[in-house]
Amino acid sequence: MTISSRAEPLSISQLNLDAQGLLESSFPLIWLQGELSNFSRPASGHWYFSLKDTRAQINGAMFRNRNRLLNFAPQNGEQVLVRAKITLYVPRGNFQIVVEHMEPAGQGALKAQFDALKAQLQSEGLFAQEHKRTLPAWPNQIGVITSPSGAAIRDILQVLQRRCPSIPVLIYPAAVQGAEAPAQLRQALALAVARNECDVLILGRGGGSLEDLWAFNDEGLARAVANCPIPIVSAVGHEVDTGLTDFAADLRAPTPSAAAELVSPDLSIVSQRLAGLHRRLRWVMAQELRTVQERLRHLSQRLRSPRQHLEQSSQRLDELQNRLQRQMQHRLTLLQGRLQPSQQRLARLSPQRLLVERQQRLATLSKRLPQPILRQLQQQQLQLAGLSKRLHTASPLETLARGYSITFKGNQAVRSVEQLQAGDTLTTRLADGEIIARVEHVQVSDTD
């Protein structure tokens, strides 16, 4: 407190500041109950009012950052319970309270009743997370349990129409406020379960006071919601409001509009996901096609056709024939080399008779010596001709030319009916083309 004297008197501002500090330090937060009067809401968003009883009154203020959290609209003449601090408005020297919280008088008893019932149901495991069901990603039909004439149903339908207009919505009407509301809400929920028409349900209403929302704190309704076999979203009041059905439901939404968003797929997001999946599918198909084409190319390079096999066999036969001719020529050259010394020795003999005999013998030897070689050559030529004929006879193309055919299932030749079943596609190769056929019936020959 500022010290003053006649020589140094206090200013009015300083006095009010000292009084404000004294009040705020002397009184903690207090609870007051009284009747609202002179209630005003200027453009600033702050509230100003008087709080009175039968014998006195006090001015009060509740600033915008606090009053925006309330779930009811105060009116003149209402009995309210406030939590406030005592202060002094320095510019005018007005003694007043600054309210931090306000609720209708009598709400405290309801709150205590709510807390007790919540604790009981929670102890029974009614709100356990393991009992919660997952909402369907794409429901075939959505059910809404609420008043058919309230703001909540309009908000829900507006959101559903925007996000997924193709999904039908079924409304189960019920009162959401008053003495009849709990029973009607239970009946509507029981009807939705009995008819089993919807894949997901929304239970909710717009905002209001604790008394207005009390129907959603009904014990029977909370138990019915917890035991509902259909996934259910509770959307009672605004974000600051909480009812027992919010804890019992599979999911709580802060507002009815938010509940509609939770139960409905967003078509724009679904379209984006489908487009992404389509691109992914095309990429995978292209990769698979390239893999198959590469395998086919590799297999086609390894596959040897009958014509290629015959050409390679003919080339091998030509090589063998050339080798045989070279061997025969080499043998003949060797024999001629062996004959030449004999001719030289014969030329050195002088008697005419010996010369004639030797010439005759030489002529005889000259005729006899090539005969084994010629016979061996003829035998090898005959053997070569036989091999060529056998190779030509064994050629698949020659077999086809004689009127036969070869049937394939895929790349495998069909040798038995046990390889086939009805519906198989076969390729039959003839000498001048192919036939594509499908198996209609398979009959095994009776070999007994």
Curated annotation (Swiss-Prot):
Keywords (A to Z) from UniProt: Cytoplasm, Exonuclease, Hydrolase, Nuclease
Documented EC number(s): 3.1.11.6
Catalytic activity annotation: Exonucleolytic cleavage in either 5'- to 3'- or 3'- to 5'-direction to yield nucleoside 5'-phosphates
Location of the protein in the cell: Cytoplasm
CDD domains noted in UniProt: ExoVII_LU_OBF
GO biological process: DNA catabolic process
GO molecular function: exodeoxyribonuclease VII activity; nucleic acid binding
Main EC class the enzyme belongs to: hydrolase
The keyword Nuclease appears for this protein: yes
Pfam families: Exonuc_VII_L, tRNA_anti_2
GO CC terms of this entry: cytoplasm; exodeoxyribonuclease VII complex
Subunit structure, interactors included: Heterooligomer composed of large and small subunits.
Family label: Belongs to the XseA family.
NCBIfam families named in the record: xseA
Protein name: Exodeoxyribonuclease 7 large subunit
Gene: xseA
